């Protein structure tokens, strides 16, 4: 039995590796925009968990005896969910809106083993620094935040611009180890069953 990560996120992979797990990487290809459109008016936690579940369910049939993990993260600011900015221009615009403010990073998790599944969202409060225009532009040009929910990272250059967080740090990076541990326990498994070091 292995852990299968239904994601190509380097951050999610890093979290698992640092926690002693070498997962099988099997990115799921789902139409996120179509799923979000179907969920118009839904609560933010439901949106991120449904995206995570779609990813896990897309590949779970190919891994019937393995633990499959799907995840999705979005930033909630002023009642609006924000995913990845994709461009330096969008990153700069978002940072000008969020600097000096507080927002919530919501990570949806779907952990499946055969027909069993645990679906849960974790929410962490982010206190953004009042970053200068020069730093915002340099950060955007670095390319680092372009593929990150909320246009920031906690574990790399973005760490300069986060004053504090309240909640689970691993969830902010992309995958809550406490959520995964609870799911494993509910399946009668232990986290240490998957350690490779």
From Swiss-Prot:
Q: Name one GO biological process term.
A: nucleotide metabolic process
The subcellular localization recorded is: Cytoplasm
Which residue positions does the secretion signal occupy? Answer: none
Question: Principal localization?
Answer: cytoplasm
**Catalytic activity entry:** a ribonucleoside 5'-triphosphate + H2O = a ribonucleoside 5'-phosphate + diphosphate + H(+); a 2'-deoxyribonucleoside 5'-triphosphate + H2O = a 2'-deoxyribonucleoside 5'-phosphate + diphosphate + H(+)
Gene3D superfamilies, per the entry: 3.90.950.10
Presence of the UniProt keyword Hydrolase in the record: yes
Q: Which CDD domains match?
A: Maf
This protein's UniProt keywords: Cytoplasm, Hydrolase, Nucleotide metabolism
Q: Which Pfam families match?
A: Maf (PF02545)
Which Gene Ontology CC terms are recorded? cytoplasm
Q: Which domain of life is it from?
A: Bacteria
- Enumerate the InterPro entries for this protein: ITPase-like_fam (IPR029001), Maf-like (IPR003697)
GO MF annotations for this entry? nucleoside triphosphate diphosphatase activity
Q: What cofactors does this protein use?
A: a divalent metal cation
Active-site positions, per UniProt? 72 (proton acceptor)
Q: What is its EC number?
A: 3.6.1.9
Sum up the protein's function in the record's words: Nucleoside triphosphate pyrophosphatase. May have a dual role in cell division arrest and in preventing the incorporation of modified nucleotides into cellular nucleic acids.
| HAMAP family xref list | Maf
What family is reported?
Belongs to the Maf family.
Q: What is this protein called?
A: Nucleoside triphosphate pyrophosphatase
Species whose genome carries this gene: Corynebacterium efficiens (strain DSM 44549 / YS-314 / AJ 12310 / JCM 11189 / NBRC 100395)
Lineage, highest ranks first: Bacteria, Bacillati, Actinomycetota, Actinomycetes, Mycobacteriales
């Amino acid at each position: 039995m292995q852990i299968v990560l239904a994601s190509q996120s380097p951050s999610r992979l890093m979290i698992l590796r640092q926690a002693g797990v070498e997962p099988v990487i099997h990115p799921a290809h789902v139409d996120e925009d179509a799923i979000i459109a179907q969920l118009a008016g839904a609560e933010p936690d439901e949106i991120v968990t449904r995206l995570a579940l779609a990813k896990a369910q897309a590949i779970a049939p190919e891994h019937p005896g393995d633990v499959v993990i799907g995840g999705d993260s979005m930033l909630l600011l002023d009642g609006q969910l924000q995913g990845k900015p994709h461009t330096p221009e969008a990153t700069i615009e978002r940072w000008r809106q969020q600097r000096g403010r507080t927002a919530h990073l919501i990570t949806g998790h779907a952990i499946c083993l055969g027909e069993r599944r645990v679906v849960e969202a974790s929410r962490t409060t982010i206190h953004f620094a009042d970053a200068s225009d020069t730093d915002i532009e340099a950060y955007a040009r670095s390319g680092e935040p372009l593929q990150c929910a909320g246009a920031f990272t906690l574990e790399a250059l973005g760490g300069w611009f986060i004053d504090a967080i309240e909640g689970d740090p691993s969830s902010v990076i992309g995958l809550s180890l406490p959520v995964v541990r609870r799911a494993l326990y509910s399946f009668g498994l232990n986290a240490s069953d998957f350690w490779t070091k």
